[in-house]
Design a protein with these regions (language model features):
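Membrane-water interface of transmembrane alpha-helices
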Residues: 18-39, 107-112
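Alpha-helical transmembrane segments and their membrane-interface junctions
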Residues: 60-85
Length: 134
């Protein structure tokens, strides 16, 4: 029983990291209105520092399964170890792509927030100029 739990631990940790990354991407896409056309996009807030900190936690969670696999490999049976040997590279590529997508989504949200702030300031300036003309 103990060998089964140890054998499943790297896979479970990897799945937690994937869920963590997908949730960060989903929240960022939602808050940043990334798929809303610019003319219909509501005001976008800048990326919260809590999301940036969560991204670093996600990055750490993405790294954890690989050393856990290395340290627990002696306690696993041969079939489980062979599975992880075959799944390790694709798993690393998937988690790397998800962490990279987190960064891209946060960048796009920050860009949309910058456009919102520019529109807000330029809108105030254009109204101020119209008031000066009257």
């Amino acid at each position: 029983m103990n060998g089964i739990v140890v054998g499943l631990l790297p896979g479970v940790l990897w799945m937690v990291a994937v869920i963590f990354a997908v949730s960060i991407i989903t929240i960022t896409v939602s808050r940043g209105h990334l798929f809303t056309p610019k003319r219909r996009r509501p005001p976008v807030d800048p990326v919260d520092w809590s999301m940036v900190k969560t991204h670093f936690m996600s990055f750490a969670a993405a790294l954890i399964p690989f050393p856990v696999l290395t340290f627990t490999a002696d306690l696993m049976n041969a079939r489980m170890l062979a599975f992880y040997d075959h799944a390790q590279l694709p798993g690393a590529i998937i988690i790397f792509a998800l962490v990279l997508l987190e960064l891209i989504a946060m960048y796009l949200q920050a860009r949309n927030a910058s456009e919102t702030e520019m529109d807000r300031r330029l809108g105030v300036a254009s109204h101020r100029n119209k008031d000066d003309i009257k």
